[in-house]
Amino acid sequence: MAGACRNPAVALAEEDKEAEAMTLHQNLIAGEWVGEDGVANVNPSNTNDVVGDYARASAEDAKAAIAAAKAAFPTWSRSGILERHAILKKTADEILARKDELGRLLSREEGKTLAEGIGETVRAGQIFEFFAGETLRLAGEVVPSVRPGIGVEITREPVGVVGIITPWNFPIAIPAWKVAPALCYGNTVVFKPAELVPGCSWAIVDILHRAGLPKGVLNLVMGKGSVVGQAMLDSPDVQAITFTGSTATGKRVAVASVEHNRKYQLEMGGKNPFVVLDDADLSVAVEAAVNSAFFSTGQRCTASSRIIVTEGIHDRFVAAMGERIKGLVVDDALKAGTHIGPVVDQSQLNQDTDYIAIGKKEGAKLAFGGELVSRDTPGFYLQPALFTEATNDMRISREEIFGPVAAVIRVRDYDEALAVANDTPFGLSSGIATTSLKHATHFKRNAE
């Protein structure tokens, strides 16, 4: 009979998870938690695991949040810097103190490995800590005028109501690096996190709320971009918008913002090149390529999905990459020893496998990986895929896939490698593996 008894600690942990999943996590509008209808947030490593139930805001909720932020702005924009410092510092301290818990939440809702989840959470805490310090370093300038009797004083003023729209792939770091500076400099915020991963964003807002933010300064509206995001774009009371996400949506944000003459900031897609020259240290080049292309399941806008390799090292590099890929463990994000977690959801998995099929049809060779993987729990598992014999005009070389799929493009020399690297409509990030200071410096200055 003793063998049938449950470990009390395990039983308590399971009960806590069940209670958390059943709790409705509401939107925060004008300092009040509101919302009745929720949507389940599901773990991509185990689709039987419901992370939590999160309210879905309507367009009317978004309008109420904007109105609350507008009403709170005059007082918050003139608040004392020590008040802002204390709130942001308290938030940073709690995030860092809860890094294991919040990192685990991140891994459960987005699918990054636990080490990546905790690392991103620490980064979020550090961001809040940095901007807590920045509140005490606000500066201006007094400069002489060419006109007698005239003084020139330059001050930095808050913009007003800032709309924040964040993506699903960095569910705690990107909200941190948008929310923290907005609050630091006296702006009020209407925040719409990605629909797929509301948990970490809700946790940050809850921490800030308890840290003492006045009502209406920070408003959380979880829901569909087509509903909540559109209401933010349509409102003349939103003075600035910061957006990270797809290029197509970013263009719509830009057009809507121009119509309202508002400030806007966009962080969008990439098709990033990683160049490997003949003189590269092979082990360093392979490790850099694997990390950049496949870690975080390749779900980073800075992932290097175009690997451009010169002829002299090409075959050795591909063989070494293949061996490294074979050693990658694809499994539950929370399991010890997992290198690559699941893709975030079924839709993204379908996109990844569609592009693998496109690559084959275009004539590229699927050299390693690319298979769906079954594990102990139902999840969206995909073995990292490496194509060879790709060309830069193929769709797999030109379109952002946003998954663990990379293509090797063979080139003659450095000059061709640079030309291929720059032959893209994107311009986000790039890298090079070489022992030549000349080529490294030239690439740094000329990669577009």
Regions found by a protein language model. Give the residues of each.
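Residue-level signal for inorganic ion chemistry
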Residues: 48, 84, 106, 128, ...
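Rossmann-like NAD(P) dinucleotide-binding subdomain of oxidoreductase/dehydrogenase enzymes
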Residues: 140-284, 411, 434
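ALDH superfamily catalytic-core signature
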Residues: 234, 240, 248-391, 414, ...
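Hydrophobic face of alpha-helices
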Residues: 66, 85-92, 103, 121, ...
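Glycine-rich loop-to-alpha-helix module at the N-terminal edge of alpha/beta enzyme cores
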Residues: 49-138, 149
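Short, well-ordered beta-strand elements within core beta-sheets of diverse protein domains
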Residues: 39, 51-57, 72-78, 164, ...
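Residues at or immediately preceding the N-termini of alpha-helices
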Residues: 44-45, 59-62, 81, 99, ...
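Terminal low-complexity tails and localization/encapsulation signals of metabolic enzymes
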Residues: 3-53, 86-90, 140-165, 265-268, ...
